[in-house]
Every structure is written in structure tokens, then in C-alpha cells.
Amino acid sequence: IITLTNYNNAVNPTYDQLIEFLKADKTDEKPYTSTYVCSDFAKTLHDSAEKNGISAGWVGARGCNHAFNVFQTTDQGTIYIDCTGMPGGATLQDKQLNVAVGQPLTGKYLFRSGTVQMGCTVDNLLVYW
């Protein structure tokens, strides 16, 4: 069970505010383990964003068995972010995802070059704000 912590003062950010928050946030540097998986990364980023005044959502993508975050920016609309780290830990793992039901889950790294192919198709989304 994932329990999200929301803050009443959290608001929708601009895209630049979101990127600045993600640069400072270190959730992506945590190691991926059998007991700390994508849903935990998404919860941690959600709670950190909310604590820092940024409204965040938690997303479960059926068909991909994957969890990540969603932000409603005031200038660029809906932005999906995946901060899931690597086994052993690594830096610069933040990714902006392309998310659409019936389409492959893909994306790009935000702070280094490279694209992401998740190897699955999104059947539907479960979104919790």
C-alpha cells in the first residue's frame, strides 16, 4: 500500500520551476532494490514535491507494471516524470515520459543525453493526486 502525503499549500508549477525542483531533488539517486521499486520512487518524489510546494500526482501504468509521477504545469500542461533509479544507485536518472493509452511508454533523460524505451504499451492509467 502506498500512502501519499499532500500539502494544502502545494500549487501547480511552471515547467521551469518543476525542472529546478527535479535538479535539486535526489530521489533518482536512491538504488533500485527488491524492496524499493518504481512505486516507492514515485511516492518519494510525490511527497518531496508536495513538501516543497509543488502539486504532484502518482501514476500507475497498467500494461507496463510501472509507476511514475505527473505534474500539471501552468505553461506546458501535463508532464510525466519518472525518477526510478538503478540497482546500486546512479545520478541523473530523471526522465520525462511520453504517456498515452494504447502507445508505447517512451521518454528522454532530463539532465543527460539519451532516450528511454520501456518496452511496454500503456493499457490505462491510475492517477492519484
Language-model-derived ranges and their functions:
Residues 1-129:
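A structural boundary/capping signal
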